[in-house]
Amino acid sequence: MPKPLIALDADGVLLDLSLGYASVWERAFGVRPAERDPEAYWPFDRWAVERLEDEASRARFRNHFDESFWEAVPAIDGAVDACVRLHDAGFHLVCVSALDAPWQAARLRNLRRHGFPIERVIATGNAGTAVSPKADAIAELSPEAFVDDYLPYFRGLPAQVHTALILRGPNGSPNVGEELRLVRSSHADLAAFADHWLAR
């Protein structure tokens, strides 16, 4: 009998993309940015970095989001342990990430190197549509639960999927408003979700 499945977002749930953002800035410009607001949702607001006005600087920054970056994004504290607990309780874990397809294998290597018990990553891309770019993947997987930290990614998901929102970075968070009705439960982090899910 197949194991019950839980789908997990990567950035903001398993991995700290905001911390990785600071490392990219340092690689691109040679200076590690100071932390401006540890409670900021968006990396640009968390770190004391200037807005890049010219295309050359923007391209220089973007070019450092390369394979070596996607293989080395830091794990969020407690996320590996939360996944191990879910895995040991009999759940099959799949990562569904709004990442461009060329970085899918690098993302899986990143997760495996941290010790996440995850053997599959689905990179959906991030096309701006009325429904979540992850909706088709979630419909195909039909997981018991889907955990994400970005409220718009719950748009258009199958009604039977338990939608769990990670409420990180309250300052400037998009996780507000009427669309909170799309969420079945909310948690401070993945460890708190695991506590909730395993206590049912």
Regions found by a protein language model. Name each.
Residues 1-57:
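Active-site neighborhood of HAD-like aspartate-dependent phosphohydrolases
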Residues 45-78, 91:
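Metal-dependent phosphoesterase signature
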Residues 70-71, 79-110, 121-124:
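Substrate-recognition element of Asp-dependent hydrolases with the DxDx(T/V) motif
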Residues 83-87, 139, 158:
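Surface-exposed amphipathic alpha-helices with a cationic face
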Residues 92-94, 118, 144, 163-164:
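Hydrophobic anchor at the start of a short beta-strand
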Residues 109, 113-124, 178-198:
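Structural recognition of alpha->loop->beta junctions
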Residues 143-185:
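Acidic, Mg2+-coordinating phosphoryl-transfer loop and its flanking beta/alpha structural elements
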